[in-house]
């Protein structure tokens, strides 16, 4: 659904001349760069508990954030109003926070920068869908899940939709604008068998409008809930220790994101807080490994047309054939390193300044097949679903709780396992990968990354074999 420049200017009640003046005023204190981020986001959500709508809501977040850079100093201020006085006060505050002295406003000429490709075009946005249109979809999903298994005792299905109108302008004269949709459909189910309780959760999230709601999506979610339930009831806690671990394709990518991906973000490297700070151009893992952070996958939760600094989204190789080739940059870190920004300057909302953040992070497929990887392991663990975990971002030390997996014995998956965690160091685990599968899967769940502020992300990985990790068991 294309909207032209005038739609955004009218929405935020600003003119190009005002944008030019605000950016120039932000530099009066001696700053070198100023940008403005306007946002109008509508949120709506519904929750169906055991067939009854138990909660729902709608709200709007509206405002502008203004940032001024001067050397290593950053000034940031925001306003929930876009009237001339409020914006002028925010620009002045940002300039003062950046420790400006005295200066003069420079002439800035506005020019529009268009996205090379719209990665999430949509026909109908969530603002046009009230509860009377959405509830039937939730009811239908609940019915499909209920029909899957007689052991189901509780079903919760929920929907969350948002639409963000974004306008950005900076002191380079670059004007960018777009509308970002997001839809999330989730299910949480409780099963009971012989007095034993187990649960499963799943979600699907896309940068899409109401057209994402289809019968096939409902079937996919219901099938996902059903899969592996029998294994849950017979799973046991195995003996722990250091052993080979096979990571299943798809959701195991969260380990790649958390334990390894953050170490590639340029702010940590610029400050010397990452183990990769001095390793650019060096071999850090097997040559079969290439790791990508990608903002260009159509309709993907982590994709962007522009990042939150107005830089077009792109596909960035952090690791290519085992060599560290790039960090993930915002404008600040790109200036420090003397490179181009990679489109990773992201923020939670207009209330936050952008920082380097991941988008869709994944490892590219290798040449091995899943079966041969498992067959190569005499004794180990196969894991494919995780819940919570902890990571020391700089060093990469991690602990992840395994939601589901299997023992590997003599090259075969045998006993289902549960109540275990895997413990290791991300960069070391990366170096210990000895096989990469040919089955890359990008997980479509509602992943959200927290780094002082929340951002929607995606992750993926093919089947990989890590030579040794510590498994916490009995």
What are these model-predicted stretches?
Residues 1-474:
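N-terminal small-residue-enriched
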